[in-house]
A protein has these predicted regions:
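Class I S-adenosyl-L-methionine-dependent methyltransferase module
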Residues: 104-105, 251-275
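Core catalytic lobe of class I
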Residues: 2-250
Length: 275
């Protein structure tokens, strides 16, 4: 596959026949064509003061919603007319004030033009984010925190998918289990992966097999540690990741080699780090 590697820009971390990492800002990147993406699977910053290398995760809530509107608008442009969008976001948050994040981002997406299809509730199982209970053992001001996240399923114009290979690789057992809107599997370890907010490969794997065909193009505009690209590659889909931080691009590359079983020569030996 060495002959398939292309280096057209300093923003392209690597580009092979099946995978592309773009080291760029999702709001300004010019390296994704409009109406070229079959499925977007992503988990954007939650604005809960996580220490990313290259992103301010402590915006005012109004600024966070404006930021979300801007990147969601770009995703809308990139999707094909029968493209889908799996948006992993919190149900709500209490850091910096109680906010209905899931409802607010879904409303913004619909205002942009996305159509709503359904919501999967992800029971993370090992979630542990409690830092306060409000009024302890008192009705004066208790906090209620749901130990779940959402995967909001949106689409651009038509839900029925007619483009692509029309080849599905999902099993009967997977289809029956995953069309149930409650998914239960563990989250990912920050320490193990080396990223402050990784999500498990199982999440994009389910979304990719359920909502796309073999050889479709999958995009993660907040690639992070590369879970979506690994799932895409292992599912015989093309994967594109956008990531503003070069160190996370390198982390994703190393995970693709280790967990995606990518031939290391295809990613390293032709000057990929000269980006």
């Amino acid at each position: 596959m060495l002959e398939n590697l292309r280096f057209s820009s300093s923003r392209i971390f690597f580009d092979s026949r099946m995978l592309k990492i773009i080291n760029d800002n999702v709001l300004t990147t010019k390296y994704i064509s409009n109406k070229s993406i079959d499925l977007i699977v992503t988990s954007p910053p939650y604005n809960v003061d996580i220490e990313y290398n290259s992103h301010n995760d402590k915006l005012s809530y109004r600024d966070y919603l404006n930021f979300s509107k801007n990147w969601l608008s770009r995703c809308f442009e990139w999707l094909k007319d029968d493209g889908r969008f799996c948006l992993n976001i919190p149900l709500d948050k209490n850091k910096g004030g109680q906010q209905s994040v899931g409802a607010d981002l879904t409303t913004i997406a619909k205002d942009i033009g996305f159509k709503y299809h359904s919501t999967v509730v992800w029971n993370e199982g090992n979630i542990s984010r409690r830092t306060a209970w409000g009024s302890w053992l008192s009705a004066s001001a208790p906090y209620v925190i749901a130990p779940v996240e959402l995967i909001v399923i949106l689409y651009k114009k038509t839900w029925k998918k007619t483009s692509g290979s029309r080849e599905s690789d999902i099993t009967k057992e997977e289809f029956m289990g995953w069309t149930n809107g409650l998914w239960t599997f563990s989250g990912e370890s920050k320490k193990k992966i080396g990223h402050p907010a990784p999500f498990p490969i199982e999440l994009p794997r389910r979304c990719i097999k359920l909502f796309s065909f073999v050889r479709d193009t999958i995009l993660d505009p907040f690639m992070g540690s590369g879970s979506t690209l690994i799932a895409a590659y292992l599912s015989k889909r093309k994967g594109i990741g956008v990531e503003i931080d070069k160190n996370y691009c390198e982390l994703a590359k190393q995970r693709l080699i280790k967990e995606g079983k990518i031939n290391q020569l295809n990613l390293i030996d032709v000057g990929i780090n000269n980006c």
